[in-house]
Structures are given as structure tokens and as C-alpha cells.
Regions:
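Transmembrane-helix boundary motif in ABC transporter permease subunits
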Residues: 2-31, 48
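Generic alpha-helical transmembrane segments of integral inner-membrane proteins
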Residues: 4-12, 16, 62, 66, ...
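Short helix-capping/hinge motifs at transmembrane helix termini and TM-loop junctions
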Residues: 17-22, 46, 50-52, 64, ...
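C-terminal transmembrane helix and the adjacent membrane-cytosol boundary/short C-terminal tail
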Residues: 21, 78, 109, 156-168
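Generic hydrophobic transmembrane alpha-helix motif, especially the helices
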Residues: 31-68, 75-76
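Glycine-rich helix-loop "coupling/hinge" segments at transmembrane-helix boundaries
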Residues: 48-49, 124-161
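Transmembrane alpha-helices
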Residues: 59, 63, 95-129, 156, ...
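Short cytoplasmic-facing helical segments at TM-TM junctions of multi-pass membrane proteins
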Residues: 72-117, 138, 142
């Protein structure tokens, strides 16, 4: 769920940033600044706001996924072949039609690249969410194994996490 929401919100944000120079000037510095905040620091806050349930885990995954998708897709949108844009201008294509028919299709490989990165990070976000406040799940199992010095259980949980990430 976090992967899907992060991909949709990241894609829409990238389109909005590419379409509006004002949004680009205002929002892009905040996006870059947000990456300076360690994700681990957000986990307790999200747990306080959203509770110990699934919501905080989804929010953590969404936050981790959002930036790679937004960044990759935005970069691809801005690198659309200038010849294609010039041809569209000559043909009288303007505004959102240029975005919809030329820029977005040309930038889909960049979106896919960001999504591939995000798919690797999604389980990490969920695990971080479980570390803060869960009574079950892989993150909880890892904390339990760590607290009881059970390295075999810790490595087993890490292997399951790695396999799960590769499957995504």
C-alpha cells in the first residue's frame, strides 16, 4: 500500500513540479531539505500521530518511497528531448497536451527507474515502522532477537527481509 501511494503521489508531484516553475522554485528546496532528516527520527512521530497500527507503517514506507520516485520522474520530465518539444510547438501543441502526449511518455523510463529504487526501500520503511511500535511482524521479530542476543534469529529475519525485497 505504501509503495502504491508513494508512487502515485511522487508521480503527481513530479508532474506538478515540471509543469510549474513557481512550484519548482518553492517546493523543490523543501524536498531536498526533507532528505536531510533521518527517516528513523520520523518513526516515533508517525507512531504518535497514526498509532501502532498499519497506518504508521504505510506512512513510513510512503515517505521513504516518495523522494526517489519524485526525483527520478521529475528529472526525466525535465530532460525530454528538446527537438520533440520544438516540433510540438511548431504543430501548435500547448500546455497540458505537451505534458500528457510528449513529456510523460518520454519520462516513463525515469519513473520506472525511481519505482525500482522505491520497491527496494519499501520493506525498509515498513520495518522501521515496526521497530518503533509493533507487537508482531518482521521488525518486531528483529528487535526481539536483538534484545535477547539471538543472532541466528536476527540473521534469519534479515534473510527473509532480503528475499522479500528481491521479490518486490
Amino acid at each position: 500500500i505504501g509503495l502504491a501511494l508513494g508512487a502515485v503521489l511522487g508521480g503527481l508531484s513530479a508532474i506538478g513540479l515540471a509543469a510549474s516553475p513557481i512550484a519548482r522554485a518553492l517546493v523543490r528546496p523543501m524536498l531536498v531539505f526533507s532528505q536531510a532528516i533521518p527517516v528513523f527520527a520520523l518513526a516515533p512521530i508517525l507512531t504518535l500521530w497514526l498509532g501502532y497500527g498499519l497506518g504508521s507503517k504505510i506512512a513510513m514506507a510512503l515517505i521513504i518511497i516518495y523522494f526517489p520516485v519524485t526525483s527520478s520522474f521529475f528529472d526525466a520530465l525535465m530532460r525530454t528531448n528538446p527537438e520533440w518539444l520544438g516540433l510540438a510547438r511548431v504543430m501548435g501543441v500547448k500546455g497540458w497536451r505537451v505534458m500528457w502526449h510528449i513529456r510523460i511518455p518520454a519520462a516513463l523510463p525515469g519513473f520506472a527507474s525511481g519505482l525500482r529504487l522505491a520497491a527496494v526501500y519499501a520493506p525498509i520503511g515498513a520495518i522501521i515502522g515496526e521497530w518503533v511500535g509493533a507487537s508482531k511482524g518482521l521488525g518486531y521479530l528483529m528487535l526481539l532477537a536483538n534484545g535477547r542476543a539471538k543472532t541466528d534469529l536476527m540473521f534469519a529475519a534479515l534473510i527473509v527481509l532480503a528475499v522479500f525485497t528481491l521479490v518486490l
